[in-house]
């Protein structure tokens, strides 16, 4: 699963996601993309589940790009632990996804197959998504 090798600070405050994506909102590498219609944090496990679903649907054909990376630590205290005694340890890593972020890109497969693979991947994610085609194709 995806996680950063080295971070400046081990723990971080949760924060909120507001507004639309200013960066990462255009298709850069592939022909087709999966764009978020909501803002949320996506875990490394959800990204991996979506990637596996896409690659299995296209039977390892074509190329898939993951455009988001989980670099936000999510901390959690152990079960049945009293409050206090400091912030909990890092439980997993999240990727911040704003409205309009291109999360996955794909190329080298027919449009119908790419769309079905992206829709299968979107069922693994906690945000509403839409399938987009690069403008300079048609």
Curated annotation (Swiss-Prot):
The keyword Ribosomal protein applies. Part of the 50S ribosomal subunit. It comes from Borrelia duttonii (strain Ly). Residues 1-21 are annotated as: Disordered. Binds 23S rRNA and is also seen to make contacts with the A and possibly P site tRNAs. One of its GO terms (cellular component) is cytosolic large ribosomal subunit. Residues 1-15 have a biased composition (Basic residues). Pfam families: Ribosomal_L16. InterPro entries: Ribosomal_uL16, Ribosomal_uL16_bact-type, Ribosomal_uL16_CS, Ribosomal_uL16_dom, Ribosomal_uL16_sf. The lineage of its organism: Bacteria, Pseudomonadati, Spirochaetota, Spirochaetia, Spirochaetales. The gene is rplP. GO terms for biological process: translation. This is Large ribosomal subunit protein uL16. Keywords: Ribonucleoprotein, Ribosomal protein, RNA-binding, rRNA-binding, tRNA-binding. Belongs to the universal ribosomal protein uL16 family. GO terms for molecular function: rRNA binding; structural constituent of ribosome; tRNA binding.
